[in-house]
Amino acid sequence: EVEIKAVADEAAAERLILSLHNELKGFKKNATITSFDVKILTALQQHHSHFKRGLLVEIPLGEYAIELAQQYGCCQIGWKDQLATDEIIKLTHQAKLDISVWTVNDVERAKYLQQLGIQGLITDVPSTMLRSLCL
């Protein structure tokens, strides 16, 4: 997963996407480009990029975030932990989008999210999570 930070404008997004295509040539089938910035997702879509895409969500958009992800051809959503409610995870699954949750440092919370069927977890304590979640 490659997270792309926000860019100033559409032209910057296009330049960045063209650069990514060159720099990540060998990873086009494996890499997922994620961003909070829809300008990045728009540029990926307009360039018919082979990279998988993911929308990162840090503000409470609810179901609208799922609609945005689908609109931009995303295969996943990365929810901020506080936004990853049971209901939003259920709706994201129903939309057939993979789910990652960030930043989860509490083991019990991570176990609960794992039981809900999320596909990815971003944490500041990876060793602890690997031991505790039996991964």
Residue ranges of model-derived segments:
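Short loop-to-alpha-helix "cap/lid" segments that border enzyme active sites
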Residues: E1-L135
